[in-house]
Amino acid sequence: MVCFSHSGMGFFKCCLAWTFVVLACVFASSSPDIPNNEDTKPLWNATWTDKLKRKLLTHYDKFSRPAQHTNATVVKMVLTFRHFELDELKSVLTVYGWMRMAWTDEKLKWNQTEWGGLHELHLADHEIWQPDIILYNSASGSSIDHYGNSHCVVFPTGEVIWVPPAQFLVFCDLDLRLWPYDTQTCHLTLGSWTYDGDQVDLQLDGHTDGFEMELWNSNSEWQVEDVKGNRAEQYYSCCTEPYVDVTYNITLRRRSPAYSAIVITPAAAIVLMTLAGFWLPPNAGEKILLNGCTAIIICLFLLYFSQKLPAMAGHTPLVGTIS
């Protein structure tokens, strides 16, 4: 490019363009060579695990169910309960535990003798297909992510075991009439979100009835009275295929030693103070003072209930009604 313009502005633009060209050539010549990924080799020798993982996961589609469409994928479930928290104001039960799910992946089979005797393979949960087991009666709003991140264990037969930590929030119909000596029953209903029973068949583990309590936190406010797991097939008018769900019926009894001191003792004191007001002579000055103190204590007592318990018609605690 040669600048033939006689005008000052044209000559300036031409020089500016030449400057950009020269700078581009300088940066291009000084930039380091980018190595070709195809020529790079790892600095370590591939293990049997590396080779097997590369073979199994190459062209693996984690969004495709690993079975023929005519065959159902059987998922065996075991829920290990660890801790319960009940929010009376929101009528929501929070369940903490582990969810054990086991199924067979036809795409993840191998012969041990051909792969150095490798008897298991650990894969990240996002690398392979997983059943979309969701809590149907969830109280967590738009979030349906019940499970934490954990690895899956795969065996040569194609069996996959996944045991993620789980947290479920479920609505409960609370009956607080006997509070704080109440017993509550809540239900967790789990099922596949997109697959029917002919595609994903949920089964309760026969050895544990679908749940375990060995790791239960015994220091919880609630004592587990009973847990039952039931499998059911639901049919809807839209479809001919069954939809399988698993329901855990949980019965909890409140442990109330602390509530006896906080609630029952003041309630008994209110009753005695009210009776004492009738026992005093009508013209006694202490009677007005005693009745005034009783009214203040009752107001504080009811204020405590309003902050602790929901205002539900037909479920008012008897201890609050008596006071």
Model regions and ranges:
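N-terminal secretory signal peptides that target proteins for export/translocation
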Residues: M1-M9
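Non-transmembrane, solvent-exposed beta-strand/loop segments in proteins
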Residues: G10-F12, W18-T19, C25-G292, Y304-I322
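Winged helix-turn-helix DNA-binding recognition segment
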Residues: A295
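Aromatic-anchored segments of alpha-helical transmembrane domains
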Residues: I298-Y304
